[in-house]
């Protein structure tokens, strides 16, 4: 069952261009280094907040990624632009059209 990581964070307005520049390298590092990484979407919210929606093939893939942290330069550069972690959640994506 696909696992969805929801991470909400705050970025100071002057840091937004650097965050967006770092995103490409972060995603490249995820594709190269994170087994089970499927997709990521970045959403801008009010009050200088952002929501990163990342889809993993399995919960174990997400857990392994979390354990690695910012182990590569592109990931570290993206994380460096974050002023504050607001919240983080994990959920599952149910099959469409199936009960349960």
Language-model features: where?
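Short, well-ordered beta-strand segments in beta-rich or mixed alpha/beta enzyme
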Residues: 2-10, 38-68
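Short, surface-exposed ligand-recognition loops at beta-strand->loop->(often short) alpha-helix junctions
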Residues: 10-21
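Generic structural motif
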Residues: 12-14, 59, 99
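An amphipathic, aromatic/His-enriched active-site/gating alpha helix that lines ligand/cofactor pockets
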Residues: 25-38, 55-90
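Generic low-complexity segments that are intrinsically disordered, proline-rich and/or Lys/Arg-biased
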Residues: 47, 74, 95-96
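Short, low-order "capping/linker" segments at domain edges
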Residues: 91-100
């Amino acid at each position: 069952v696909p696992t969805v990581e929801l991470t909400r964070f705050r970025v100071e307005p002057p840091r937004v261009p650097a965050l967006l520049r770092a995103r490409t390298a972060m995603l490249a590092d995820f594709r190269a280094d994170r087994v089970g990484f499927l997709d990521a979407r970045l959403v801008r919210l009010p009050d200088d907040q952002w929501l990163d929606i990342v889809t993993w093939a399995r919960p174990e893939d997400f857990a392994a990624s979390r354990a690695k942290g910012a182990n590569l330069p592109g990931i570290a550069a993206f994380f460096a632009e974050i002023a504050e972690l607001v919240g983080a959640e994990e959920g599952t994506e149910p099959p469409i059209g199936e009960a349960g």
